[in-house]
């Protein structure tokens, strides 16, 4: 068998196995291969992006799931890909052009797109390379990009079909408009920011001259587009005014006073200015009352001719000018400081404007209805279940989806305007045809408008989420219903994603899938939480607390980071915390996982040194009749952990699986079984035939436990376990642990009573070790040990384990007694300890300086009493007990209880020695 290096080199090991898996096509499944299908399409990161901790967390969860399913015998496809990220890429390129003194219009559409593809080729692979470093067991040969030819055809097909069904239409509606990028943006691309602004109160005079109404707004510049003032129909203060008109300052327009239930009569003055062309709520009021929609702002953020004297001013300059003008007219009542949420363009980094614009929309209600119906059958199933309500609420309270963007990089809308019908130019009244390509479009145009029809394709592109919504099935070959991948792996098995895009991505995928495949696109939706810092703050660029995963990977290794992230999960969907020292680029949490990796490495080296040249297969299974107590215990633990871990992996209990395996590997295997096996693995010179037979049994058990431990840990720490498993099994480098079956569960090995009794034996050994430390015994000193218990089964286990106890405690002798027997032969000058129902006595007279030991105990008591006094005083202080955070008070009480217990124990030991 190959020899393991003394120390673990994670970076070199990980790179080698990643290359080996890829070279051998380990994760490139054949759709015709046997096994139940299991498929996951990864959420496609933007090509502009770089790896952040959210990606690392998502990857760790997905890869743990798919690697287990592979071990469980499934035919697994994990399909990777990237998103073209229309706005993000275009923003980057336009910034580059600006530095060159150019705009995209200098290049023209074709030239700009050529540059975009060149940029994608040069820079777009960065995040893919970073994802590879995470050890993703995906099929890189099936990697997709949302602008790939096949996916582009799927997008066109989807658009055409939805249009033919009347579910895509063109109309003028309010959209989020980013003046910086000159495009409509989706709700997801809008970030709400808390800002310190103002609330301006001003009066609108009644046209009759008999008074005024007072309104308030955070956007005074929009008042130029007001077409009404609304009051609540039950508000008696204004009931007599409904139907009258007000005169709008500056423009002199008369606007009606309308009654609408949207108005809260107890908020402010109970009067709301209505600007249908610049506010979504006002737009709805305007629709209900047939109000005109007056746009006062251009798409570049300057005021238009409808703004009268303010035409040409930037929107923020206009705000100041309008306020100053109202003040001059005596209409400004007051200005209040006001902290409120303002929608910002995520890409343009400027406040967005709700603007009326002619755009393409998807009629979402018919699509959402199909999803709601499926959800009644838990299709898909949400983990945790609480997110199902969030998903249902989004599908219930839904608006039509604006899918057009005024950009060049992206899926160009497959619609052609018949410009020959409007004098050879595009106008708002130009008719259009929708088609899969220009040839089909021209045929449709000629059929409808005559042979002389001239067409011109829409300049706009589709919202990135349109193509992302097709991701689960377009990547598998749709619209080709005969696609082998589509037939084998669709619907997909599990979607793993964050809660923040349940509507923006999850719901759009289910709506699209329902429309085009008649099925929901995934069976399960696993919603994970956020990665937070040590202060429980969400990690983000704006907070400046993000962590570059590659820094931690370079320092500790990919497996250490992955294991740390998954182990932190306290339950499906829960946020996790990750500490990080920015001065040293270190993380205690990830370092602990690296130490665990080193522990596994050293345990495997120990096994290799003791197994000789025999592999687990060559050693075979031990004879059950020849098993020692420790063997039966560790094999029972192995079977139990096997069963629990498989259940946890299968049911998304990934954090619980990681914690359970950590405890098993570190405590049961490394701390106890390896220590207990040492004397048997090294029987000394001229061993007896019985000792040699027992040595072989110990080797057989050790080989089985170590190799299966590697298998069970593989989904969590794939590179490390692949390396260690190969070293133990001697398999060739083209035979992968990643593709082996999950270890068979040995039900017959399970023994609840034995595990409970052995836990008592471990407790007894711990107490003896602790008493030796209290006494200050040297490691070379042997001392008799006396155990006292009234439990017969515990006494039997202690008697069976006498040799183990002697070896691990350096006991001179071990005596197991019943209470009556111990009372009949009392021991003087002994240290006593307790473990459950077991009393442990360590006679030390003649072995240590009793006076010195008593002196140490008296010092311990004095120190504890001083700390007790301080803690009790703190808790007795009302300023602390009543005002400190509850968790701080609870921690103080716990410290007090601990110190009191320590003092009581020291007093008892002092009394025993007196």
From Swiss-Prot:
Catalytic activity: tRNA(Val) + L-valine + ATP = L-valyl-tRNA(Val) + AMP + diphosphate
Record family assignment: Belongs to the class-I aminoacyl-tRNA synthetase family. ValS type 1 subfamily.
Major subcellular location class: cytoplasm
The UniProt record lists the keyword Magnesium: no
CDD domains: Anticodon_Ia_Val, ValRS_core
Listed GO CC annotations: cytosol
Gene name of the encoded protein: valS
Chain segments annotated as coiled-coil in the UniProt record: 847-914
Quaternary structure annotation from Swiss-Prot or TrEMBL: Monomer.
Locations listed in the record: Cytoplasm
HAMAP family membership: Val_tRNA_synth_type1 (MF_02004)
Sequence motif 'KMSKS' region, location on chain: 538-542
Pfam families in UniProt: Anticodon_1 (PF08264), tRNA-synt_1 (PF00133), Val_tRNA-synt_C (PF10458)
GO BP terms, alphabetized: valyl-tRNA aminoacylation
Keywords: Aminoacyl-tRNA synthetase, ATP-binding, Coiled coil, Cytoplasm, Ligase, Nucleotide-binding, Protein biosynthesis
E.C. code: 6.1.1.9
Gene3D superfamilies cross-referenced by the UniProt entry: HUPs (3.40.50.620), Isoleucyl-tRNA Synthetase, Domain 1 (1.10.730.10), Valyl-tRNA synthetase, C-terminal domain (1.10.287.380), Valyl/Leucyl/Isoleucyl-tRNA synthetase, editing domain (3.90.740.10)
Motif 'HIGH' region positions after renumbering to this chain: 45-55
Residues that, per the record, bind ATP: 541
Keyword NAD annotated: no
Purpose of the protein: Catalyzes the attachment of valine to tRNA(Val). As ValRS can inadvertently accommodate and process structurally similar amino acids such as threonine, to avoid such errors, it has a 'posttransfer' editing activity that hydrolyzes mischarged Thr-tRNA(Val) in a tRNA-dependent manner.
Protein name per its UniProtKB record: Valine--tRNA ligase
Gene Ontology molecular function: aminoacyl-tRNA deacylase activity; ATP binding; valine-tRNA ligase activity
Domain-related comment: ValRS has two distinct active sites: one for aminoacylation and one for editing. The misactivated threonine is translocated from the active site to the editing site.
Enzyme class: ligase
């Amino acid at each position: 068998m190959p020899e393991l290096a003394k120390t673990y080199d994670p970076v070199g090991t990980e790179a080698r196995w990643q290359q080996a898996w890829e070279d051998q096509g380990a994760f490139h499944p054949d759709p015709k291969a046997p096994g139940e299908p299991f498929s996951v399409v990864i959420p496609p990161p933007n090509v502009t992006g770089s790896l952040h901790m959210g990606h690392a967390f998502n990857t760790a969860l997905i890869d743990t799931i798919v690697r287990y399913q592979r071990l469980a015998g499934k035919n697994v496809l994990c399909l990777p890909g990237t998103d073209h990220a229309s706005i993000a890429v275009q923003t980057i390129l336009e910034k580059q052009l600006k530095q060159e003194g150019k705009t995209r219009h200098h290049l023209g559409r074709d030239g700009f797109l050529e540059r975009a593809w060149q940029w994608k080729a040069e820079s777009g692979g960065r995040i893919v390379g970073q994802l590879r470093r995470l050890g993703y067991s995906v099929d890189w040969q099936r990697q997709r990009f949302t602008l790939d030819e096949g996916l582009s055809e799927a997008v066109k097909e989807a658009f055409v079909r939805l249009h033919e069904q009347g579910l895509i239409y063109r109309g003028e509606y309010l959209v989020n408009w980013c003046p910086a990028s000159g495009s409509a943006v989706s709700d997801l691309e809008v970030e709400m920011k808390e800002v310190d602004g103002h609330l301006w109160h001003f009066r609108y005079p009644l046209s009759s001259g008999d008074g005024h109404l007072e309104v308030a707004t955070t956007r005074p510049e929009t008042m130029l587009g007001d077409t009404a003032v609304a009051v609540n129909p039950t508000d008696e203060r204004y009931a007599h005014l409904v139907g009258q008109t007000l005169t709008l300052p500056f423009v002199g327009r008369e606007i009606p006073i309308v009654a609408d239930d949207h108005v809260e009569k107890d908020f402010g003055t109970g009067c709301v200015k209505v600007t249908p062309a610049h506010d979504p709520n006002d737009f709805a009021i305007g629709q209900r009352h047939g109000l005109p929609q007056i746009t006062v702002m251009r798409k570049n953020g300057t005021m238009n001719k409808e703004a009268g004297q303010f035409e040409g001013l930037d929107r923020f300059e206009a705000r100041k000018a309008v306020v100053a003008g109202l003040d001059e007219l005596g209409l400004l009542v007051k200005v209040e400081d006001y902290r409120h949420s303002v929608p910002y363009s995520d890409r343009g980094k400027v406040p967005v404007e709700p603007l009326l614009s002619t755009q393409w929309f998807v009629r979402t209600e018919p699509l959402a209805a199909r999803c709601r119906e499926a959800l009644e059958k838990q299709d898909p199933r949400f983990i945790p279940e609480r997110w199902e309500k969030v998903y249902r609420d989004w599908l219930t309270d839904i608006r039509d989806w604006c899918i057009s963007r005024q950009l060049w990089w992206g899926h160009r809308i497959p619609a052609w305007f018949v410009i020959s019908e409007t004098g050879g130019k595009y106008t708002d009244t130009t008719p259009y045809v929708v088609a899969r390509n220009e040839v089909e479009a021209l045929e449709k145009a000629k059929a409808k408008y005559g042979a002389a029809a001239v067409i011109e394709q829409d300049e706009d592109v589709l919202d990135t989420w349109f193509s992302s919504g097709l991701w689960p099935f377009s990547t598998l070959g749709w619209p080709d219903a005969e696609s082998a991948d589509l037939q084998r792996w669709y619907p997909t098995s599990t979607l793993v994603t964050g809660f923040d895009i349940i509507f923006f991505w999850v719901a759009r995928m289910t709506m699209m899938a329902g429309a085009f495949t008649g099925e929901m696109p995934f069976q399960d939706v696993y919603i994970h939480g956020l990665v937070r810092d040590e202060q429980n703050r969400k990690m983000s660029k704006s907070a400046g607390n993000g962590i570059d995963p590659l820094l931690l990977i370079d320092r500790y290794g990919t497996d250490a980071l992955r294991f740390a992230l998954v182990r932190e999960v306290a339950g499906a969907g829960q946020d996790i915390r990750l500490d990080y020292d920015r001065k040293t680029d270190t993380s205690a949490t990830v370092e602990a996982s690296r130490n665990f990796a080193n522990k596994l490495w050293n345990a495997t080296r120990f096994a290799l040194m003791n197994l000789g040249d025999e592999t687990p297969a060559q050693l075979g299974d031990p004879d059950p009749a020849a098993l020692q107590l420790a063997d039966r215990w560790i094999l029972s633990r192995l079977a139990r952990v096997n069963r629990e871990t498989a259940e946890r992996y299968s049911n998304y209990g990934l954090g619980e699986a990681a914690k359970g395996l950590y405890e098993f590997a570190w405590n049961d295997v490394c701390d106890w079984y390896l220590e207990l096996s040492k004397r048997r693995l090294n029987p000394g010179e001229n061993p007896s035939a019985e000792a040699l037979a027992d040595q072989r049994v110990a080797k057989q058990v050790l080989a089985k436990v170590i190799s299966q431990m590697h298998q069970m840990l593989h989904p969590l720490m794939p590179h490390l376990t692949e390396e260690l498993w190969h070293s133990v099994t001697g398999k060739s480098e083209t035979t992968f642990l990643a593709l082996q079956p999950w270890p068979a569960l040995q039900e017959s090995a399970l023994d609840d009573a034995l595990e409970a009794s052995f836990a008592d034996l471990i407790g007894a050994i711990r107490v003896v070790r602790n008493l030796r430390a209290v006494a200050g015994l040297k490691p070379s000193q042997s001392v008799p040990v006396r155990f006292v218990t009234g439990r017969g089964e515990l006494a039997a286990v202690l008697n069976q384990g006498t040799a183990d106890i002697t070896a691990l405690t350096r006991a001179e002798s071990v005596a197991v007694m019943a209470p009556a027997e111990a009372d009949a032969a009392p021991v003087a000058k002994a240290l006593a300890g307790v473990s459950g129902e077991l009393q442990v006595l360590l006679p030390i007279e003649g072995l240590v300086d009793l006076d010195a030991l008593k002196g140490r105990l008296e010092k311990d008591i004095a120190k504890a009493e001083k700390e007790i006094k301080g803690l009790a005083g703190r808790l007795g202080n009302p300023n602390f007990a009543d005002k400190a955070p509850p968790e701080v008070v609870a921690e103080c009480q716990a410290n007090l209880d601990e110190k009191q217990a320590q003092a009581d124990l020291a007093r008892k030991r002092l009394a025993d020695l007196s």
